[in-house]
Amino acid sequence: MPVAMDLMKRFHMSNRRCRFSGKQVCRVVATRRQILEQTSLGFGALAARVLFAEESDAPSRFDNPLAPKAPHLTPRAKSVIFMYMDGGISQVDSFDPKPRLAAENGQARPFAIDATVFNQNGNLLASPWRFKRCGQSGIPISDLFPQLRSVADELCVIRSMTAFSANHPNATYALHSGHARLGRPSVGAWVTYGLGTQSRNFPGFVVVHGGQMFSGGMSNIGSGFLPANYQGSMMLPSAPYLPNLLRQDVSAGVQTAKQRVLRQLDQDLANSAGENSVIEAAIANHELAFRMQSAAPELFDLSRETAPTKKRYGLEAEYANTRKYGTQCLIARRLVERGVRFIELTINPGNSDRWDQHSDLKNGHARNALAVDQPVAALIKDLKARGLLDSTLIVCTSEFGRTPFAQGTNGRDHNPQGFSMWMAGGGIRGGTVYGATDEYGYRAVENKLTVHDLHANMLYLLGIDHTRLTFRFGGRDVRLTDVHGRIVNELIA
């Protein structure tokens, strides 16, 4: 190992006996920061300790925190694809037709309302899109989503979803964590904490990022008070995909030599620290990053997909954002095939300010729908054709809906009182509609659901009892659903 020996000679070394085995060990008298600075290691290169653990006779003390765990219940789904439609899709323009809006378009609203964000509240505003009953189930879907109509019988449309807040950051964070205040783990982190992942080469919680940053920031995919292993890992749908992951060394041999040095540092630090979850988590993350160096290029190599498959997902579409979201959906399917537990897709920021159309509703919503309609329908069909839909739970939702009356002349304000979302796949009763808003589409009046209910049912379908998934924090056993959440049998096949 001439390269490794050369690196070792850069640092003063001393001998001492291991307090566990009594054997003489070599100790590098240098800080980890010094090693990293001197050897120019990136995060990915740091990760090869696992390579040498396999060569060692000594048993590893570092259990994989992402290893699969037994569910509480019989699972209906193994993976989740969470499609976050940032900004607020209008329920009365997508999945909740309201004939009275058309009949009374332009008239003063005949019902009381709560305060809106901008208080520029106009008259009733009819949808510019027509609805059509689709599939054998007859679920009404508007002209916004012509491709999604073809999979209507796979969807369970919930028309009675509610939100905690009318503000983007609070509502977005509540959707992701069950709470409107920062510091809580994301639902993806909870799922990975509860079940681990079936993938050895990828994190359990992956975000395929379209570019639109979350309102409220990265805490929406964070691990909160859970160990950092469970936070979401961001991937991009185009190069460089995973920044700073690829090996920077001129050869694999140089990287291997560096890892032999760092392995001694890791083991010495771990032995000195004793049982330390922070250190063990860091080492486990390094090991995962090393494995990803080999696995990630294959994941993102879409040349392995057939031309018809790429066309169905919209990778040849005229609209750039359709191509981008289509790539995200295709990567999501490939992550499911590789055993990743929780996958979130975010949207592209170039779609007329997300789904947040306070003005020019018709053009803004049309562009947003054009970006996602074809890819989402293709993903559902592709998963079904491959026998994966029954084990993959798909959730598509915004943080809240929009008002059935105008903001200004041609927009809609935020509405947390009642809105639509849908689920499909693993354990979901397809071809159904659950809940209802009032005759104008403003407020949920039948079978109202909260984010706690949504999370409880997501966990249930994955085989997790939401009342038993807890983590000790602040002197109490905390759970994703707090003291709330109910299982809705009507949603479940």
Predicted regions: what is each one?
Residues 2-493:
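Ligand-binding pockets and gating/stacking loops
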